[in-house]
Amino acid sequence: MSGELNGNDTSAQAAVSAGSVLEGAAFADEGEQHNESMKTLVLGALGVVYGDIGTSPIYAFREALHAAATNGILARSDILGVVSLIFWALTLVVTVKYVLFVLRADNNGEGGILSLMALVRAALKGRPDLILGVGICGAALFFGDAVITPAISVLSAMEGLEIVAPNLTPFVVPATVVILVTLFSVQKLGTGRVAIVFGPIMALWFVALGASGLWHIFDDPTVMAALNPYYAVRFLTVSPAVAFVTVGAVFLAMTGAEALYADLGHFGRKPIVRAWLWIVFPCLLLNYFGQAAFILSHGEAAALPFFQMIPSFALWPMVLLATAATVIASQAVITGAYSVARQAVQLNILPRLEIQHTSEKLHGQIYIPRVNLLLGLAVVILVLGFEKSSNLAAAYGIAVTGNMLVTTVLLYIVMTRIWNWRVSRALPIILGFLVIDMLFFSANIIKVHEGGWASIGIATVLVLIMWTWVRGTRHLFQKTRKAEVPLDLIVEQMAKRPPTIVPGTAVFLTGDPKSAPTALMHSLKHYKVLHENNVILTVVTASKPWVASADRARLSQYNERFMLVTLTFGYMQQPNILRALGLCRRLGWKFDIMTTSFFLSRRSLKASVHSGMPLWQDKLFILLARTASDATEYFQIPTGRVVEIGTQVNI
């Protein structure tokens, strides 16, 4: 699942450098991998993991300079201070925090905010709601990021047309909308066939970034003095008010850093780290320092420095390559949104969603129509509403900084509860990360009126939806449980007054195997019959991403008529009840689909003043329940073998 293979690797046998030292620290506990497999995984990581942070140079340095300018004037110390801040931010946040620490906090090979939440909740007794709330906030912020990334990325690339052909400026927004609508429209076809070129295109993009930056560093080689943290510290202290605003813009250079952890399960830690240390990080630095040197020698170039430093003969190819890179970055975010949505459904944070598999060979290739539609609409609305990437920049940082802040808080619990670090060892590290995270978060939160409201608004709506679903399902479970009859009592009553026995097997789905399922009660009440064999089936989602087939099913014979079956799936796995029940043959149950009927209860919910939730939340929960995907489709049960029994419940 982690995408890692065992073997030997000679690619790291180079002279001792900062990269090799960091890599050695990151992989101190891992064996070597096959060289060819490693190259393939590194190339794949370039196409999926680094699209977002890799396209940041298009707009990040420009926005930071605009924030740093005093009355529209930039001093040499301002330019050196900004590029120094970018260098040290990338070093401390991405290279130190994520590479050396966060990537180690995997949940059975999987990463991402919900995986981290599940890992922490499993480690803490009682599975506290506080951690669940933190995870929900992190997931909501991720979706906010997923809305803004395609909008700002593609829009910033298309703004290159303003340099190539100024007369095409009015077409920047329409062209961006066309590209994004096309991108979201083709999602249902799957990306398996075209994804193979994502890696090579992004590799070419990073080469172009590095080459263009290196070329212009020679315009003013003294720009390399900004590697000294003195320039960053001086910039922060000379004019704190200006520096504080600038820090918020500097953070744009790190948007996408959370993808290193989110995509951990797709490639494994080693390919992600090697791609960063040996390709992405050096090329990003070369480009940022190249932009700084170009502006130092061409003071008027601060409007769109990324494209202005490209030679005229290479402008069109660069605009096209930038557009391709931003589309790939957007695709990676969209795919990530599908993955997080599926995890949220499995962890019961969101209602069931229709999930379509777009590839027979690649299990991870999924398409969620409802997520795609809502995400696409939100992205297009943002582009039409903000019109310029500089306007969207204010909205971008809040979601990502918030997500990083949540990650740091959960990382502390992992360090102390799972890695068993002493508080005296973990706390100084976490406090250092928190200081940096809080600085970036506070510098971005002040931009609420400039566009940050969009990010906060999206996250707030999603938090309300997810918390309402969690709270509503708990209230519903407690209410129905009070009305249910213990299975022991029903079996005892049937022993005294046996119902009519009919041939075949009946499978009753329930969330509580100790209580008689509602469908069973209604079947006995209205039809007065009991099947020859009855299975009380419970589907459980584990706190880990994957559960092996050998551990999928547990059987226990209750009596001659009843059997209890529990199916366990990881939160990254799509439940397939039919296939899972087939595994029960090895455990002694001769499962035959042709003689089996599945009984499901479909609840009709009505709001109640005694639900324990506000009326508006009752109505929202009922709406979410009505829009939930059908259980038959979600659990992949043959429709011809399903009997649904309706019940009305007041919540």
From Swiss-Prot:
Keywords assigned: Cell inner membrane, Cell membrane, Ion transport, Membrane, Potassium, Potassium transport, Symport, Transmembrane, Transmembrane helix, Transport
Cytoplasm in keyword set: no
GO cellular component, one term: plasma membrane
Gene Ontology terms, MF aspect: potassium ion transmembrane transporter activity; symporter activity
Kinase keyword on record: no
Subcellular location, record wording: Cell inner membrane
Pfam family, one: K_trans_C
TM region(s), chain numbering: 41-61, 82-102, 130-150, 163-183, 194-214, 235-255, 276-296, 309-329, 366-386, 395-415, 426-446, 450-470
Membrane topology: Multi-pass membrane protein
Major localisation: membrane
Organism domain of life: Bacteria
Catalytic activity: K(+)(in) + H(+)(in) = K(+)(out) + H(+)(out)
Functional note: Transport of potassium into the cell. Likely operates as a K(+):H(+) symporter.
Family: Belongs to the HAK/KUP transporter (TC 2.A.72) family.
Protein name (database record): Probable potassium transport system protein Kup
Organism: Brucella suis (strain ATCC 23445 / NCTC 10510)
Lineage: Bacteria, Pseudomonadati, Pseudomonadota, Alphaproteobacteria, Hyphomicrobiales
